[in-house]
Design a protein with these regions (language model features):
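A short hydrophobic beta-strand segment most commonly corresponding to one strand
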Residues: 87, 122, 137-155
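A short, N-terminal "cap"/entry segment at the start of jelly-roll beta-barrel domains
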Residues: 2-63, 78, 112, 157-187
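Short, charged/polar surface micro-motifs in flexible loops or helix N-caps
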Residues: 60-62, 72-74, 94-96
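Conserved short histidine dyad/triad with adjacent acidic residue
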Residues: 65-82
């Protein structure tokens, strides 16, 4: 029996890749592509390897976007939130998810959850979160699916920064090449 996440991932791979050569292309025929041949970058973030497997700009996706992200030991995402749902499938490694609600003036002390190979978790719309690779000996690799691409990220300096003070990063690093447009906070 296939998991829904595997079906979503495989469907995205089969139906979303395009025949166009441009990284920012959104038209073309569906293709099957090797993940190892897709563009990979860390976008100036030490310890990160990001591949857009199926993206709004790279592949014309409108409802979901799929990433393959690898974090080296000790690396992490920023404390952030976004106006989309997010699903993670941990492919290898282990780490910690920190998450706090956006229902108060600021996130506050986050809840902590252990994440590990073959686990999955989701982030509700606008919940403030951060993922750390807390394993000293192994990379943390995750398949990430977001709704409503392209992602609009609000970054926090710490867990006690008011939501209204969070800094918008849009377009996000992997979308900068393809999109330049101002966007307002949706909270």
């Amino acid at each position: 029996m296939c998991s829904p996440f595997l079906i979503l991932f495989l469907s995205s791979l089969i139906f979303s890749a395009t025949a166009e050569a441009s990284h920012c292309s959104s038209t073309g025929l569906p293709l099957v592509r090797k993940i190892s041949e897709l563009p990979q970058d860390n976008y100036g973030r030490a310890g990160l390897s990001h591949i857009t497997v199926a993206g709004s700009f790279s592949h014309g996706m409108r409802e979901v976007e799929v990433w393959l992200q690898t974090f080296s030991p000790g690396s992490h995402t920023p404390i952030h939130r976004h106006s989309c749902e997010e699903v993670f499938v941990v492919l290898k490694g282990s780490g910690t998810l920190y998450i706090a609600s956006s229902s108060h003036e600021y996130p506050g002390k986050p809840q902590e959850f252990s994440i590990f190979s073959n686990s999955t978790f989701h982030i509700p719309v606008n919940d403030v979160h951060q993922v750390w690779n807390t394993n000293e000996h192994e990379d943390l690799q995750m398949l990430v699916i977001i709704s409503r691409p392209p992602v609009k990220v609000f970054i926090y300096k710490d867990w006690f920064m008011p939501h209204t003070a969070a800094k918008l990063k849009f377009p996000y690093y992997w979308d900068e090449e393809c999109l330049q447009a101002p966007i307002k906070d949706e909270l």
